[in-house]
């Protein structure tokens, strides 16, 4: 019995170019004395910032991880880890811009990125359009941002930190 895959017919002129999908996550604990950066934006009056080697922007970092995952290019730590002092204190937008450059240099076109930040604050909806513009400009492709809470469960529910989960779609160029 033939498998369904063997019944697939390729269009004349060559193979179908399939998109590649990656997933990325990032988690940081809150730390007093730091500014809160999330989704490329500084959130004044939203409490302590996030601990990290860079600005600890979980949304930008998860987006980087998703792009690297989709392209098979490792992860955030490989490219911008704590062993790389030149990235110390870097903004998430700077890292995301560089991640997109690396992915394109490896021969990929970026389709889009979607990111969800998980935690009770900041309230992403208040500045969603602003965040999406900044992140889309950094990637050079559409980036959507959403927020979710955990109904008091886990470390985000206890207001100990933030988590973000992202997906990215890329296609091999040419």
From Swiss-Prot:
Record field: catalytic activity: 4-CDP-2-C-methyl-D-erythritol 2-phosphate = 2-C-methyl-D-erythritol 2,4-cyclic diphosphate + CMP
Residues reported in the UniProt entry to bind 4-CDP-2-C-methyl-D-erythritol 2-phosphate: 26-28, 53-54, 75-77, 155, 158
InterPro entries per the UniProt record, alphabetical: MECDP_synthase, MECDP_synthase_CS, MECDP_synthase_sf
EC supergroup of this enzyme: lyase
Cofactor binding remark: Binds 1 divalent metal cation per subunit.
Cofactors demanded by this protein: a divalent metal cation
EC number: 4.6.1.12
Binding site for a divalent metal cation: 26, 28, 61
GO molecular function, one term: 2-C-methyl-D-erythritol 2,4-cyclodiphosphate synthase activity
Listed pathway(s): Isoprenoid biosynthesis; isopentenyl diphosphate biosynthesis via DXP pathway; isopentenyl diphosphate from 1-deoxy-D-xylulose 5-phosphate: step 4/6
PROSITE patterns from the UniProt entry: ISPF
Pfam families in UniProt: YgbB (PF02542)
UniProt family annotation: Belongs to the IspF family.
Name assigned to this protein: 2-C-methyl-D-erythritol 2,4-cyclodiphosphate synthase
Gene: ispF
